A protein has these predicted regions:
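Short proline/glycine-enriched turn/loop motifs at strand-loop junctions of beta-rich domains
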Residues: 54-56, 96
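Short, exposed beta-strand-loop hairpins at the edges of beta-sheets
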Residues: 92-117
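Beta-strand signatures of extracellular beta-sandwich domains
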Residues: 60-62
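Transition segment at domain starts
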Residues: 1-42, 121-122
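Exposed aromatic-hydrophobic patches
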Residues: 48-50, 84-93
Length: 122
């Protein structure tokens, strides 16, 4: 995968996301799958910053309930790159809440690469 830095007109930055509703810090799933960086969620907008995850095939971003199997969560789309800032939108009438997680998941092998538990921003 490639390094990304989303630069769309609706890009969320630290300046535009001064009041984050939810935040989390990525952690790797195990010794073979590392993840780091920050996730910020404001409304339906999700921002991964200083993000890095072990490269792998068929990686997707999911929003999951606590204890929920990743593939049963809400797909936010294919991972745009394994390094760099990136943006996603929560689809339809779904929403994020404290205690949920953002998970980087390999669809091909049904393996989690990393996750960030969401909590209220301070």
């Amino acid at each position: 995968m490639k390094k990304t830095d989303s630069s769309s007109p609706d890009e969320m930055t630290n300046d535009t996301m001064k009041v984050n509703e939810l935040v989390g810090i990525f952690q790797g799933a195990d010794e073979n799958h590392d993840a780091k960086g920050k996730v910020s969620i404001s409304g339906k907008n999700i921002r991964l910053e200083n993000f890095e995850v072990t490269n792998g095939p068929d990686l997707y971003v999911y929003l999951v309930e606590e204890g929920q199997e990743t593939k049963k969560g809400i797909s936010l789309g294919k991972l745009k790159g394994n390094i760099g800032n990136q943006n996603y939108k929560i689809p339809g009438d779904h929403s994020a809440s404290s205690g949920m997680e953002i998970v980087i998941w390999c669809k091909q092998f049904n393996v989690d690469f990393g996750r960030a538990e969401l909590g209220k921003a301070m």
